[in-house]
Protein backbone atom coordinates (compact mmCIF):
# COMPACT_ATOMS: atom_id res chain seq x y z
CA UNK A 1 0.00 0.00 0.00
CA UNK A 2 1.28 3.45 -0.91
CA UNK A 3 2.33 5.45 2.18
CA UNK A 4 0.38 8.55 1.14
CA UNK A 5 -2.80 6.58 0.50
CA UNK A 6 -2.36 4.87 3.87
CA UNK A 7 -2.26 8.31 5.59
CA UNK A 8 -5.62 9.22 4.04
CA UNK A 9 -7.16 5.88 4.99
CA UNK A 10 -5.92 5.99 8.58
CA UNK A 11 -7.10 9.58 9.10
CA UNK A 12 -10.53 8.66 7.75
CA UNK A 13 -10.62 5.60 10.02
CA UNK A 14 -9.60 7.50 13.17
CA UNK A 15 -11.56 10.72 12.64
CA UNK A 16 -14.44 9.50 10.43
CA UNK A 17 -13.42 11.98 7.75
CA UNK A 18 -15.07 11.51 4.39
CA UNK A 19 -13.13 10.33 1.36
CA UNK A 20 -13.94 10.16 -2.32
CA UNK A 21 -12.50 7.12 -4.06
CA UNK A 22 -12.12 7.35 -7.84
CA UNK A 23 -12.29 3.79 -9.14
CA UNK A 24 -12.25 2.97 -12.87
CA UNK A 25 -14.06 6.20 -13.78
CA UNK A 26 -16.63 5.91 -10.96
CA UNK A 27 -16.74 7.60 -7.57
CA UNK A 28 -17.42 6.07 -4.17
CA UNK A 29 -17.93 8.44 -1.23
CA UNK A 30 -17.68 7.43 2.40
CA UNK A 31 -15.43 7.00 5.40
CA UNK A 32 -13.21 4.06 6.26
CA UNK A 33 -14.57 1.67 8.89
CA UNK A 34 -11.89 -1.01 8.50
CA UNK A 35 -8.62 -1.56 6.67
CA UNK A 36 -8.98 -5.20 5.65
CA UNK A 37 -5.49 -5.71 4.20
CA UNK A 38 -2.99 -3.94 1.94
CA UNK A 39 -5.35 -3.98 -1.05
CA UNK A 40 -8.87 -3.72 0.45
CA UNK A 41 -10.70 -1.24 2.68
CA UNK A 42 -14.26 -1.29 3.99
CA UNK A 43 -16.16 1.98 3.63
CA UNK A 44 -19.53 3.21 4.89
CA UNK A 45 -21.69 5.95 3.39
CA UNK A 46 -25.27 7.22 3.59
CA UNK A 47 -26.65 4.72 1.12
CA UNK A 48 -24.60 1.61 2.02
CA UNK A 49 -23.53 0.20 5.36
CA UNK A 50 -20.57 -1.65 3.82
CA UNK A 51 -18.66 -1.11 0.60
CA UNK A 52 -15.40 -2.90 -0.19
CA UNK A 53 -12.94 -0.80 -2.18
CA UNK A 54 -10.09 -2.62 -3.90
CA UNK A 55 -7.10 -0.29 -3.82
CA UNK A 56 -5.42 -1.91 -6.81
CA UNK A 57 -8.22 -0.42 -8.94
CA UNK A 58 -7.94 3.04 -7.40
CA UNK A 59 -7.28 5.97 -9.76
CA UNK A 60 -7.29 8.73 -7.11
CA UNK A 61 -8.46 9.56 -3.60
CA UNK A 62 -9.66 12.88 -2.15
CA UNK A 63 -10.41 13.91 1.44
CA UNK A 64 -13.46 16.06 2.20
Q: Where is each model-derived feature located?
A:
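Short glycine-rich, low-complexity segments
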Residues: 1-29, 37-40, 44-64
Amino acid sequence: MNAEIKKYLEESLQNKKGLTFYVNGNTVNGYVIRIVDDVTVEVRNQSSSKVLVFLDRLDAIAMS
